[in-house]
């Protein structure tokens, strides 16, 4: 992948600099700062990066390593050719809509925290969302973020902003509720009302001014009413500049294994283009797995490969283990 446009994957939790605190000292050209990318001023028009034919295409990766999620059910095969759209692999701005589930399951104290104590999924999700937003902002200050919370219905909590502090100010004063269902169609309708989708004359050659991405953090019991896909949702999902990433936090119990796998399979089936990422994490497992999933979502959706082709070890022959995964 072209290092001049590739986004980095390291989480950062530091506060963004205030106006007046910015320095003009040029950093050396390193892997984390290729060609002094972070030292260039912010421009209003997305940079157009030309790439040779087929460069960085996921379909040309040989012998890919498996993904490092809890079970291999999220390694979905690449989609059929009719949906394999080739879009410019550029680092254009993102409009990221983070949807946080507020069902009562998120308050269950079952996750194993870093110090060995028990934590709930809501607190862990709040921390990883803040780290994600701050890190994406450092990668490209043109990125914008919005926060949506989901009870029985989705509610727009924070409008699009490029200031991480505005998002984080709304993030922690949240409480879980008993929820009877999850209105996925309502979530898509809300996003369609609040977001304008980009359009270009040529999808394959002209970079979009921005892309739209939903990151859904979902934790509902498998006993709730089945999720459904409508025609309007299909149209949104087939847009080449729209991405729907999912982190599914399930109870991990063996007796309900088939049920939560069905839900995870439904989310996987929504990705007709093969460009979205889906992860499942057990609510009884380590919180590190949850943070690892969010760290992998730092990659720009136009630049990342199919999820089944993604590898996170430094060497091809190196076997991945929980200790070697991305930590935050």
From Swiss-Prot:
Residues 1-13 have a biased composition (Polar residues). Component of the ARISC complex, at least composed of uimc1/rap80, abraxas1, brcc3/brcc36, BABAM2 and babam1/nba1. Component of the BRCA1-A complex, at least composed of brca1, bard1, uimc1/rap80, abraxas1, brcc3/brcc36, BABAM2 and babam1/nba1. In the BRCA1-A complex, interacts directly with abraxas1 and BABAM2. Component of the BRISC complex, at least composed of abraxas2, brcc3/brcc36, babam2 and babam1/nba1. The gene is babam1. One of its GO terms (cellular component) is BRISC complex. One of its GO terms (biological process) is mitotic G2 DNA damage checkpoint signaling. Residues 96-297 are annotated as: VWFA-like. Keywords: Cell cycle, Cell division, Chromatin regulator, Cytoplasm, DNA damage, DNA repair, Mitosis, Nucleus, Ubl conjugation pathway. Component of the BRCA1-A complex, a complex that specifically recognizes 'Lys-63'-linked ubiquitinated histones H2A and H2AX at DNA lesions sites, leading to target the BRCA1-BARD1 heterodimer to sites of DNA damage at double-strand breaks (DSBs). The BRCA1-A complex also possesses deubiquitinase activity that specifically removes 'Lys-63'-linked ubiquitin on histones H2A and H2AX. In the BRCA1-A complex, it is required for the complex integrity and its localization at DSBs. It comes from the Eukaryota. InterPro entries: BABAM1, vWFA_dom_sf. Residues 1-84 are annotated as: Disordered. The VWFA-like region is similar to the VWFA domain. Its presence reveals similarities between the structure of the 19S proteasome and the BRCA1-A complexes. The keyword Iron does not apply. Belongs to the BABAM1 family. Residues 64-74 have a biased composition (Low complexity). It is found in: Cytoplasm; Nucleus. This is BRISC and BRCA1-A complex member 1.
